[in-house]
């Protein structure tokens, strides 16, 4: 009924989050762009139940018939390369202009559903709300395109497993699922988002593996040694390679021999063609582990790579987070800086700060920058970057934001103006971080950056904007979503950064 006001209990939040999940439910994408060839109107109108990337790949393969899972994989050919491209870069068949239309439509639909739910939580009639731009209460800006469309990744991680020809020493990306037992590792040199240098290093690592007497570690309990390869590059062309190795029961002497062999291969052997700036080796018995859990061992070269961004020289350690599209990151960080509205009286709180680029780029415009980051190496990089660039009004703290933030805020006076910037991982922010932000009255402006606004990130936004809830210890006034800016850092994929400005 028109004008009906109703409050939605917060316990129904789980249902809403399941409905707003990116590319996971029918009708989420409006697809108002021109229909790509081979995509049916039914598909375009109901996108899309199930896995988005799989549906995209299927619909884009015009005229291809479905095939049963082969009893043997056979040689590598164009079909394997296309299948991998459809999984890793499902929008690769569209022009970049069409890709941007798809992404903008998706972000708009997510915001519409999110706003509608928040309005109901606050007892506002959705039918009488006055929109600012096309059914949205917040101002949705046009999507900012990536300055670089192809080969934009500055970091790639390659797996090792059986290729289409059955060779277990194949380096690339996975097709299939472990559940179905049909995982195939396909070389990635044809993917549009991978730079040639990354593919070159991966190819030479494959050459090395195939001449090594040691087997790869495909499944932990089955033994094997050689594991994944990570390649990092900067805009100057410097290249860092990180090889992960399962030590099994090798002695330190035996491990030393293997490190010397791989080092020799990339310095004086065939791998010298890669021109690596540095080579790291990490012994790991876990799927993934940090430098603190298992130190990265520098076999040769420089311990860091450096990047120039926003007039800063930035140091990047092997496991430090840095946006994978450097040129796009500059657009993203400029957008964040503009939305913060900081001035010389402002304290900038940079939560999940990584190497500290956002805070440090705004340091000259603020009274102080306070950064919080989980990874010690990233914090060390941020401190180095601050010192090298002559920035003296910043401090960075290592640890979990939910443990550090409450104490950090208590030490500040209520009269100080604080602007918070959060750029969490896809898992979102811990609920105690949300509590601390909501309950600290001096935070009037919050900029939230999300590369995938669903799941916990959606819950974060809703708990920032919902009415005070003593049961959840959300006592402060709610934030209001004012502006949203999509920034494309991931051409050829459905992903997109979304920068949200909240005030109260």
From Swiss-Prot:
Species whose genome carries this gene: Homo sapiens (Human)
Phylogenetic lineage: Eukaryota, Metazoa, Chordata, Craniata, Vertebrata
Compartments it resides in: Mitochondrion
Function: Mitochondrial S-adenosyl-L-methionine-dependent methyltransferase that catalyzes the formation of 5-methyl-uridine in tRNAs and 12S rRNA. Catalyzes the methylation of uridine at position 54 (m5U54) in all tRNAs. Specifically methylates the uridine in position 429 of 12S rRNA (m5U429). Does not affect RNA stability or mitochondrial translation.
GO biological process terms held by the UniProt record: tRNA processing
Protein name: tRNA (uracil-5-)-methyltransferase homolog B
Keywords: Methyltransferase, Mitochondrion, rRNA processing, S-adenosyl-L-methionine, Transferase, Transit peptide, tRNA processing
Gene3D superfamilies named among the record's database cross-references: 2.40.50.1070, Vaccinia Virus protein VP39
Similarity remark: Belongs to the class I-like SAM-binding methyltransferase superfamily. RNA M5U methyltransferase family.
Domain of life: Eukaryota
